[in-house]
Swiss-Prot record:
Residues spanning the membrane: 29-49, 102-122, 133-153, 163-183, 196-216, 228-248, 306-326, 344-364, 368-388, 402-422, 444-464, 468-488
Coiled coil: none
Protein name: Putative glycerol-3-phosphate transporter 1
Species of origin: Arabidopsis thaliana
Source superkingdom: Eukaryota
Biological processes, Gene Ontology terms: phosphate ion homeostasis
Membrane topology: Multi-pass membrane protein
KW Transmembrane (keyword) present: yes
Induction, per UniProt: By inorganic phosphate (Pi) starvation.
Keyword Aminoacyl-tRNA synthetase: no
Family recorded in the similarity comment: Belongs to the major facilitator superfamily. Organophosphate:Pi antiporter (OPA) (TC 2.A.1.4) family.
Length: 523
């Protein structure tokens, strides 16, 4: 473990891939070239995390083909129309029994509970270790245990605890991903247009989900084991690319900013948008170099309400992530049931909507300078979208896809905004006094708390859908979306008050972010 600890920046070696590119070029890479490499490598890295994570939701119907269709038409109709060969084989023990849906829900919650638990420690370690190596180890470990879950197919393994342990270990290694990629991107990009840049970059979540869905659905015809092994191999390969090319920070590779930001364009009232993470040269005191503690990070104004909001936002988002293909395949659309592969492909519309929603939320929050108003508005608007999808999604494929797209846009928009731009804002809060070692910890706290909700949602869905109906599940999701918006009420009020103050020419303008942060000290 000691070998992973960061030494002085100037003593760290450049990644081998960077040295190779510079040898080919014959000179040092420009700062903008490094930024492009960071965006591409971290985008691919986290997309591969989500591709591996998405597999379970696609394979659910193959493992548990005899699950109750929760109040719709009988299973006989389902198996006589569009039933896949995998379904006809009777599923896979122990998931094809009467409690199969519950067992799959327990697998999901085990993965997400360990993921959430590991997230808190991942952020703490990420602020103290070489992020390139830390991220690489996480990706290789994720690929290994994702693949071992699939090996159960060829090994004829039917032990529930084998699959449970593989998912838990995969979740532990997956927790290394998000704090690491956000911290690295934060090292290279300043606050200007952060919401838009990170909104576009955050498309890796939906791109990974879409890719994982398509790969897993395509592999089902060859055996469900391949649906796990192929994404597992992909994330290992990308992990090696990450090790070879990822520059953790400008100081690590000796890069110098090749453009000077106009201070007048960076200033908002009396507030100046400083770089997302200050370099070590900007923080000369030991206090500024000290990594922020867990409790200290929780006390940063705004962290608690946004973290709790994300708890409910991810509860909704991850219920769709893990159960949407299963729900679609168990719902008669135009009177017919879809195959597992078709249902998996159709479910990608939720993630396509998520890409659009993430970009929209980032752009809107940049334009109006109000993160909380944007996030809360999206969450409130998602409530009628959820209602209409449940009520009219069965009418036709077009209606299902359109409403799924709209729901994904409204649910994933605030999720993307909070986990990227908001986390970066709070990780550089003025109360930190320039401390550059807080972003991974703050990101881990916010996303870790959200991941607890991500574990609760799929678990409740498994129990509710097997004992009640999908209408009850959607009622739960609408309630969660309402609470998510409600938790931001105080921040929204502060932002609205700031906007009113800004509209008065006699009053001195202040940064909306600073105003909100000053008025949530007690939250």
């Amino acid at each position: 473990m000691g070998s992973l600890m960061q030494s002085e920046p100037e003593m760290e070696k450049k990644p081998i891939g960077i040295r190779f590119l510079e040898r080919i070029k014959g000179s040092k890479l420009s700062y903008s070239a490094y930024q492009a490499i960071v965006l591409i490598v971290t985008f691919l890295a986290y997309a591969s995390y989500h591709a591996a994570r998405k597999t379970t939701s696609i394979v659910k119907s193959a493992l548990d083909p005899q699950s109750p269709d929760t109040g719709l038409n009988s299973l006989l109709l389902r198996f006589t129309s569009f039933g896949s060969s995998v379904k006809e084989e009777g599923g896979w023990a122990p998931f094809n029994g009467p409690d199969g849906t519950v067992l799959l829900g327990e697998i999901d919650v085990a993965f997400l509970a360990v993921y959430a638990f590991g997230m808190y420690f991942a952020g703490h370690l990420g602020d103290r270790m070489n992020l390139r190596i830390f991220l690489t180890v996480g990706m290789i470990g994720t690929g290994l245990f994702t693949s071992l879950f699939g090996v159960g197919y060829w090994g004829n393994i039917h032990s529930f605890y084998y699959f449970l342990i593989m998912q838990m270990l995969a979740g532990l290694f997956q927790s290394s991903g998000w704090p690491s990629v956000v911290a690295v991107v934060g090292n290279w990009f300043n606050k200007k247009k952060r919401g838009l840049i990170m909104g576009i970059w955050n498309a890796h979540t939906s791109v990974g989900n879409i890719t994982g869905s398509l790969i897993a659905a395509a592999m089902l015809r060859y055996g469900w084991g391949w649906s796990f092994v192929v994404p597992g191999v992909i994330i290992v390969v990308i992990g090696l690319v990450n090790y070879a090319f990822l520059p953790v920070s400008p100081e690590n590779v000796g890069a110098e900013r090749d453009e000077v930001l106009d201070s007048s364009s960076e200033k908002i009232g009396n507030s100046v948008n400083e770089p997302l993470l200050l370099s070590s040269s900007d923080s000369e005191t030991d206090d500024k170099k000290r990594a922020v503690g867990f409790i200290e990070a929780w006390r940063i104004p705004g962290v608690a309400p946004f973290a709790l909001c994300l708890f409910f936002a991810k509860l909704v988002a991850y219920t769709f992530l893990y159960w949407l293909p299963f729900y679609v395949s168990h719902t008669a659309i135009e009177g017919e049931y879809l195959s597992d592969e078709t249902a998996g492909n159709l479910s990608t519309m939720f993630d396509v909507g998520g890409v659009v929603g993430g970009i929209m939320a980032g752009y809107i929050s940049d334009r109006i300078g109000a993160r909380a108003i944007t996030a809360a508005s999206f969450m409130y608007c998602s409530i009628p979208a959820l209602f209409f999808y449940r009520s009219y999604g069965h009418v036709s494929l077009l209606a299902n896809a359109s409403l799924m797209f709209l729901t994904g846009m409204l649910v994933n928009g605030p999720y993307a905004l909070i986990t990227t731009a908001v986390s970066a804002d709070l990780g550089t809060h003025s109360s930190l006094k320039g401390n550059s070692r807080a972003l991974a910890t703050v990101t881990a706290i916010i996303d870790g708390t959200g991941s607890v909700g991500a574990a609760v949602g799929p678990l409740l869905t498994g129990y509710i859908s097997s004992r009640g109906s999908w209408t009850a599940v959607f009622t739960m999701l609408m309630g969660a979306a309402f609470v998510a918006g409600l938790l931001l009420t105080r921040l929204v009020m502060a932002e609205v008050a700031e906007k009113i103050a800004e509209s008065r020419p006699s009053e001195e303008c202040r940064s909306p972010v600073d105003y909100v942060q000053d008025h949530v000290m007690e939250v």
